[in-house]
């Protein structure tokens, strides 16, 4: 995401407008997003879930990448996303999930109905305080909020440069700590390092699912693709069809309803 504009009065307003503008870039392209975006490691869900959890809500669910892990663990899952296109894809791949249009700030879900609420790869599009209030409303007493991000592992030098070319704005700084509202306590984190086996063509398609690329004009898109092709094929020497282990880390956060 673009850095927060500096300033006193104009800055927050401009940042909010930019956040909403970038978020709109995911309204379409559910099939492509589902095909090219990675899933999440199993232990990110295992660590997140409270003992005895039965009912889960996945907010900003997209095409159901994280919801799939919840279903595999036997939970009844309700998924909420503002994109009709994303939910259409989710219903195709996970018909057992209840899929509803809504946002983290207005889910439309019932009071005190869930043991855990997950927000994977989406909290940065939300108003964290308003979303915290809404999520606390739908959680049962002692319920857990989980915030999950997949990001490229930029501690690996070649991946760091790749992320710069991709304009991967979701790579967090080491001191990153998400904002949650006063409804929650005991915020703690968990990190999983893993690799996704991909081809250079997969990486090129992955870039096309990023908000920076989706909102860019044609000349900017062409420049990004040209730089990326040079980096993968000429600088790194990869070939078409070669399987490349792409290092990721998944950063998970959880807190309990106070």
Region locations from a protein language model:
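A short acidic, Gly/Pro-enriched loop at the edge of an enzyme's catalytic core
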Residues: 105-116
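Short catalytic micro-motifs in class I SAM-dependent methyltransferases
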Residues: 121
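A short, conserved alpha-helix within the catalytic core of class I
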Residues: 126-134
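Conserved catalytic/acceptor-binding region of the Class I
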Residues: 133-198
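Conserved class I S-adenosyl-L-methionine
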Residues: 2-52
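Conserved beta-strand/loop positions that form the S-adenosyl-L-methionine
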Residues: 59
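Conserved Class I S-adenosyl-L-methionine
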Residues: 3, 179, 183-258
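Class I SAM-dependent methyltransferase SAM/SAH-binding core
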Residues: 55, 63-106
